[in-house]
Amino acid sequence: MIVRSFKEFEGTDRHVKSASGTWESTRIVLAKEKVGFSVHETILYAGTETSMWYANHIEAVVCTKGDAELTDRETGKTYHITPGTMYLLDGHERHTLKVKEDFHCICVFNPPVTGREDHDENGVYPLLTEEV
């Protein structure tokens, strides 16, 4: 059993800030825990727009605080995301989050991330593996 406090992650490599400056993420459960998924608490900043495409991962997201507009770039459909709303990127959809109010969310990834990932020029997380 693993029990952790978010305070344990402050100032560690599990607290990641994006190169784009649009988000920060606390990586709570990672590939090295060997449970088949990873869990993150992520904050996307108000007034930012982040384009993403998880070509190598499935992601489930639950909004816990804030306000954002999610656009599926493949269909053009837009969704209003507020606390209590979830979305699942089960088809590797290219999507954009336009953040109106700091957007706090819990994200689950499969396959799990290692914690070192950041979006590349296409919005993709590379498929990294944990060395044994």
Swiss-Prot record:
Q: Which SUPFAM superfamilies match?
A: RmlC-like cupins
Example GO biological process: ectoine biosynthetic process
Extract the Pfam families matched here. Ectoine_synth
Into which EC class is this enzyme placed? lyase
List UniProt keywords, sorted A-Z.
Answer: Lyase
Q: Which GO terms describe its molecular function?
A: ectoine synthase activity
Involved pathway(s)? Amine and polyamine biosynthesis; ectoine biosynthesis; L-ectoine from L-aspartate 4-semialdehyde: step 3/3
Q: Gene3D superfamilies, per this entry?
A: Jelly Rolls (2.60.120.10)
State its Enzyme Commission number(s).
4.2.1.108
* Residue stretches in coiled coil: none
Q: Is the keyword NAD in the record? A: no
Catalytic activity reads:
(2S)-4-acetamido-2-aminobutanoate = L-ectoine + H2O
Which InterPro entries does this entry report, sorted A to Z? Ectoine_synth (IPR010462), RmlC-like_jellyroll (IPR014710), RmlC_Cupin_sf (IPR011051)
PANTHER family xref list = L-ECTOINE SYNTHASE, PTHR39289
**Entry's HAMAP family?**
Ectoine_synth (MF_01255)
Q: Which protein family is it in?
A: Belongs to the ectoine synthase family.
Q: Which NCBIfam families match?
A: PRK13290.1
This molecule's function is given as: Catalyzes the circularization of gamma-N-acetyl-alpha,gamma-diaminobutyric acid (ADABA) to ectoine (1,4,5,6-tetrahydro-2-methyl-4-pyrimidine carboxylic acid), which is an excellent osmoprotectant.
Instruction: State what protein this is by name.
Output: L-ectoine synthase
Q: Which organism is it from?
A: Streptomyces coelicolor (strain ATCC BAA-471 / A3(2) / M145)
What is the gene name?
ectC
